[in-house]
Amino acid sequence: MTLLGSEHSLLIRRKFRSVLQLRLQQRRTQEQLANQGLIPPLKGPTEFHDPRKQLDSAKTEDSLRRKGRNRSDRASLVTMHILQASTAERSIPTAQMKLKRARLADDLNEKIALRPGPLELVEKNILPMDSSVKEAIKGTEVSLSKAADAFAFEDDSSRDGLSPDQARSEDPQGSTGSTPDIKSTEAPLDTIQDLTPGSESDKNDAASQPGNQSDPGKQVLGPLSTPIPVHTAVKSKSLGDSKNRHKKPKDPKPKVKKLKYHQYIPPDQKAEKSPPPMDSAYARLLQQQQLFLQLQILSQQQQQQQQQQQQQQQQQQQQQRFSYPGMHQTHLKEPNEQMARNPNPSSTPLSNTPLSPVKNSISGQTGVSSLKPGPLPPNLDDLKVSELRQQLRIRGLPVSGTKTALVDRLRPFQDCAGNPVPNFGDITTVTFPVTPNTLPSYQSSPTGFYHFGSTSSSPPISPASSDLSAAGSLPDTFTDASPGFGLHASPVPACTDESLLSSLNGGSGPSEPDGLDSEKDKMLVEKQKVINQLTWKLRQEQRQVEELRMQLQKQKSSCSDQKPLPFLATTIKQEDVSSCPFAPQQASGKGQGHSSDSPPPACETAQLLPHCVESSGQTHVLSSTFLSPQCSPQHSPLGGLKSPQHISLPPSPNNHYFLASSSGAQRENHGVSSPSSSQGCAQMTGLQSSDKVGPTFSIPSPTFSKSSSAVSDITQPPSYEDAVKQQMTRSQQMDELLDVLIESGEMPADAREDHSCLQKIPKIPGSSCSPTAIPPKPSASFEQASSGGQMAFDHYANDSDEHLEVLLNSHSPIGKVSDVTLLKIGSEEPPFDSIMDGFPGKAAEDLFSAHELLPGPLSPMHAQLSPPSVDSSGLQLSFTESPWETMEWLDLTPPSSTPGFSNLTSSGPSIFNIDFLDVTDLNLNSPMDLHLQQW
């Protein structure tokens, strides 16, 4: 039966009470307690308390006495370190300690005195000796051992502090032997003197001492005649004993003096004993070396600082020779000098950093070698070794050897004092294709080798082309070396010879020394090798271009029967031709390489391009229209465009900027002969978008204008058959034009063919060429149109190769920037957006579908077609995005063209990707592989 909590507590309380009651009943009364003595009686007398107190005091006394008896005496406390011994008591153990030490010392001395001498050790075969010595010892055994001990202890007092020589002079027995005998003993005694320091290492070195003394014993006994051995042996033993006797007080100092560098010193002793060894000759020598090196470093730095200004002046002169606009060599020079200025006391070579933009010397000299060597004094013998070494170091010669060797090395330089001597190890590689703005990319790597960016590097390029590749590094721009170029002279004032000379001069001086022509000849030979390599590469490229041209011509003949591209493609193709004068020669050759599989229009444009470039030997050789990713449009030919919208184009690495120019502007600009460098090039490319012409797309046919007529033209694109017809006529005309160009090898100065091509270009619906122009409003009808576009693409699949040829020639990374004078974007684009908005839905979708046909094949290179102005709202193609970053352009390939185009803004930048190589429809893979290999 379980109890509730309250009931349980009640039970406990009751039990507790009952227990309390029992205890109260059973407890003793006070009387009982008082009787038992537990409490004082209630009314009792004081006698009860007194005895109790006495008892307590007696107890404490007893306990104290007990403790006093048991406590330990003082001696035990002192031994237990509980108490300190008093001064009186402390003197006793100290005296005892002294006595004990004295006793130990006496014992030691006795043991040392009684220890076996060298002769005994020899007799007992403890020490190895020659047989002759043993025989001599056996002959004089008894007398020797006894006399030795006697002499040792008699002479000890007089010979305590004496060296062996002094002991020998004092020894009364010294005169007994004949003079030759005495002389013969002297050498062994000298050896004793030499050996004694080694024997002093420890007072307890009983084992080592006999050994050290036995050697003198041997050496003494060997040469002596029989009467003398006793005397010499006694002397050696007495000397050893005297040393050992008095070794104890001298202990600390000899140990320090005998410190050997290979001995191990425990860390607790190092701090105390490290200073004494530093006084040794070796330490002083180290300090001298350090000071000498510091002096060398300081003198080198001073020399470099003094010569810096001279070098800067010289390099400014060289800079004028190079005539590279906007290239400040001092920027290159300063970091190089800082590298060279790093003090390099040892003769390890630092690779010379090039002090002139074109020169890179692979030199085996030390860091100071880049300095201009000063004049040598007439008397080389007067120079110190350090100065001689410094002069040798400046001249890149070996620094090791005696002073005479150093002087001999410097003698040849006395004749041509003050003239820098080219280093024997220098291989100066002159890379001609350095454009003023590409030079930064050429600053030599620490190894001192140039990385030739492109195998197709070419002779010095014209300033215009250098402008094109403004910020681009040569590795990315194929600009300068196009097969068309060959090695023809370029407008750059610095001819190859001058650049060679200036590169030879490097940073050393404005002019090379007249002496040591052999050095120059070596350098020139090296440079000639480089030039030969470059020319060989160019010839190879030319051969490839010729092969590609042949293939293209064959394809032209085969493709002439095929249907021309849809109107969109055809217009772009013709535009490529028109813009071709602006395309680089390289681009032409390489573009053809890309388009080798493509139909005739492409080949035509490809051939046009090289010739156009060649014809413009002037700054028009904007061969570097292919802007490397580092190129900024400002330096690019586009930068020269008159229209601000074009100038504002953000740079995209591989985008070839095709700014659409109005047809009139194109006609004006296509004249390749225009001498202006960058602007002329831009005009050549038809990139000039004249604001006067209005926001017209640069299609020579009726351009997009804000007027309603232009809108109606755009909304009603030509039918497919018309486009095909126009394509046929255009291809024929392009063939004729290319024939003329091939025969003449140049573009005609008036570039009538270009104008004719431009005029014949049919109107491109605004969106056809520029993905940017597409209004972002795809509808179901748009999808239908896109499907129709895909059908057209099937028709156009064969011809698309032609179209791609043209586009790739113009857009290939080889640099055909201006091949398509497509859409003049900029101020025109906002009106174009409004125009697109004004289109009926069907027309706009037609535009989309037609447009989608192009972007697929054109994909990445299409970027060149429409460089959008920053202002354009619809054109989100930011050139700032590198094509490698935006990999979405594959969405624009024909099969998926419709969805790809719905994302205009996102896919826009991606259009510029060079990844089009992945597109199977484009037969570009083999030619592009060539270009990528050359890259």
Swiss-Prot record:
Tissues expressed in: Expressed in smooth muscle cell-containing tissues. Expressed in the heart. Expressed in the aorta and bladder. Weakly expression in the lung, testis and kidney. Weakly expressed in the stomach. Weakly expressed in the intestine and colon.
Annotated region (Disordered), positions in chain: 37-73, 155-283, 337-378, 498-518, 579-605, 654-731
GO cellular component: chromatin; nuclear speck; nucleoplasm; nucleus; SRF-myogenin-E12 complex
Effect after changing residue 866 to A: No effect on SRF activation; No effect on SRF activation, on interaction with EP300 and on SM-promoter activation
Compositionally biased region (Low complexity): 342-357, 695-709
GO MF entries: histone acetyltransferase binding; histone deacetylase binding; R-SMAD binding; RNA polymerase II-specific DNA-binding transcription factor binding; transcription coactivator activity
Effect of residue 893 to A: No effect on SRF activation; No effect on SRF activation, on interaction with EP300 and on SM-specific genes transcription
UniProt subcellular location: Nucleus speckle
Post-translational events: Ubiquitinated; by STUB1/CHIP at the C-terminus, leading to its degradation by the proteasome. Phosphorylation by GSK3B is required for STUB1/CHIP-mediated ubiquitination.
Protein's UniProt name: Myocardin
Source organism per UniProt: Mus musculus (Mouse)
The organism's taxonomic lineage, starting at the top: Eukaryota, Metazoa, Chordata, Craniata, Vertebrata
Gene: Myocd
